[in-house]
A protein has these predicted regions:
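Catalytic cores of soluble metabolic enzymes centered on carboxylation/carboxyl-transfer
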Residues: 301, 340-509
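N-terminal beta-alpha lobe that positions the nucleotide/phosphoryl donor
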Residues: 34-316, 320-339
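Short, positively charged and aromatic/hydrophobic N-terminal segments
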Residues: 22-23, 34
Length: 509
């Protein structure tokens, strides 16, 4: 990385005005007097985005809106990537493998210092929830756009975060108070809680190190597998045991908190549609959460945030059972993949808020100012082949047609000729639809998926077309096992959702 490594304007990689653009989507509108006046008093002038792909582009766009300069970092595999073209400046950080580039703290910090960045935005994934990275930023005079390193270490440990929720008086799923030491202790808690149980990694998320266990024999097989998977993914193989909630929904609350003790919640997101414990489709508001339950869950989320001394943007996640009782499961100390649905619902630019809060500014609004309008649904577009057990589908994008029209937002890193690499998470974009109600959002999303043409790599677009055609989804009759059951169903998807939408139930309104 020595010779040839230099600080260069991103325009070296092409005229920004001619770079493939995603500006035809539905942009969030800043509140009057906010985004356009912030730059007059900003302590931050240049932000290094410690990420890649669509989330790097999202942060760079926020920088543009705020009149700030941005620095993209890139690996050898991402030299021609779209986020490199979008940024004010670009800086190489290593080889194609993530451990040699985006996960290499020394190289990322070297890039920040070399480019004279004031702050680092971590996006999601990679180093976004790495407390050591946040601490290094703090120690080296860089503003980390996120919670403090101490807070991140607390909520990043699921066992400690669970105890934090208990101390705050928020209900948690019954389980072991600490990670279990061995299989014998796991059996002890399984006997105490009763099957089914969940094995969960004490660190990390995304479904890694998680197993549903139905009996003693399965526990013997699953414990070692879950622990090994967690160790490989997070460098921490500790496992704790929870009682499994039967047919739950996964509902999360978006929070914002400043360093002056002010907090707000921005309502919930429904994240129940998951494949192998990983979210694939999110929506807001949840079709089963009424204003009373929303307020209760929002208050609980802020109680956890207060107990953890949380600041900046974060998400408090809950399981919701069939009796509408909710249980804390974890805190995500970063911007979520699914943040656009909240932005479309509230009109609040979450990335701009993160940048403001990271400078020690007070929240620019109060809870009473938060309004929810309409309904938004997001599909995560992965370069995976649904017909081949969702195997990764790297390759060159030969043809690309991006959907548009009323209520459609596309957050993507694709362009014709882009070579989708094999080295990273296969998410290449997010397609979001907004409507006055859930039915309108569903119809708009179905239209947009039909318009979305990607040739050269396989994507999960056919999966979402199938989901949107399913009457159980349309009528909001699903739980966290819904998608896996749908995928196991040999029936073919229908060509139209018209008939199902005409009979949609009140729960979608």
């Amino acid at each position: 990385m020595g010779r040839g490594k230099k600080f260069v304007p991103a325009s070296k990689f092409g005229d920004l005005r001619q770079a493939p653009s995603r500006l035809n989507g539905m942009a969030t509108k800043p509140r009057p007097g906010y985004a356009w006046t912030m730059s007059e008093s900003l302590a931050i002038h240049r932000i290094l985005v410690a990420n890649r792909g669509e989330i790097a582009i999202r942060v760079i766009r926020a920088c543009r809106d705020l009149g700030l300069e941005s620095v993209a970092i890139y690996s050898e595999a991402d030299r021609e990537a779209l986020h490199v073209r979008f940024a004010t400046y670009a800086y190489p950080v290593g080889e194609a493998t993530a451990t040699d580039s985006y996960l290499n703290i020394d190289r990322v910090l070297q890039a920040a210092h070399a480019t004279k960045a004031d702050a680092i935005h971590p996006g999601y994934g990679f180093l976004s929830e790495n407390s050591e990275f946040a601490r290094r930023c703090e120690n080296e005079g860089l503003i980390f756009i996120g919670p403090t390193a101490e807070c991140m270490a607390l909520v990043g440990d699921k066992a400690r975060a669970r105890q934090c929720a208990i101390d705050a008086g928020v209900p948690v799923v019954p389980g072991s108070p600490d990670p279990v030491e061995n299989i014998a202790e796991a059996h002890h808690f399984a006997d105490k809680l009763g099957y089914p149980i969940m094995l969960k990694a004490a660190a990390g998320g995304g479904g890694k190190g998680m197993r549903l266990v139905e009996n003693d024999a399965e526990l013997d097989r699953s414990f070692e597998t879950a622990s090994s998977e967690a160790l490989s993914a997070f460098g921490n193989g500790r496992i704790y045991v929870e009682k499994a909630i039967v047919t739950p929904r996964h509902v999360e609350i978006q929070i914002l908190a400043d360093l002056h003790g002010n907090q707000v919640h921005l309502g919930e997101r429904e994240c129940t549609l998951q494949r192998r414990h990983q979210k694939v489709l999110e929506e807001a508001p949840s079709p089963v959460v009424d204003p009373e339950l929303r307020e209760k869950m929002g208050e609980a989320a802020l109680m956890v945030a207060t107990q953890a001394e949380y600041s900046n943007a974060g998400t408090v996640e809950f399981l919701l059972d069939s009796d509408r009782e909710f249980y804390f499961i974890e805190v995500n100390a970063r911007l979520q993949v699914e943040h656009p649905v909240t932005e479309l619902l509230t009109g609040i630019d979450l990335v701009a808020e993160q940048i403001s809060l990271a400078q020690g500014k007070k929240l620019s609004f109060e809870q009473k100012d938060v309004e929810f309008r309409g309904h938004a649904i997001e599909c995560r577009i992965y370069a995976e082949d649904p017909d081949n057990d969702f195997a990764p589908s790297p390759g060159v994008v030969k043809t690309l047609s991006i959907p548009g029209g009323p209520g459609i937002r596309d957050d993507s890193c694709l362009f014709e000729g882009y070579n989708v690499p094999i080295h990273y998470d296969p998410i290449v974009g997010k397609l979001i639809a907004w409507g006055d109600n859930r039915l309108t959002a569903i119809r708009r999303l179905q239209r947009a998926l039909t318009e979305y043409k990607i040739r050269g790599v396989a994507t999960t677009i056919p999966l979402f077309q199938r989901v949107l055609a399913d009457s159980d989804f349309i009528n909001a009759n699903f739980d966290t096992g819904y998608l896996d059951r749908l995928l196991n169903d040999a029936s073919e998807p229908t060509d139209s959702i018209t008939d199902d939408c005409d009979s949609i139930t009140e729960v979608a309104r």
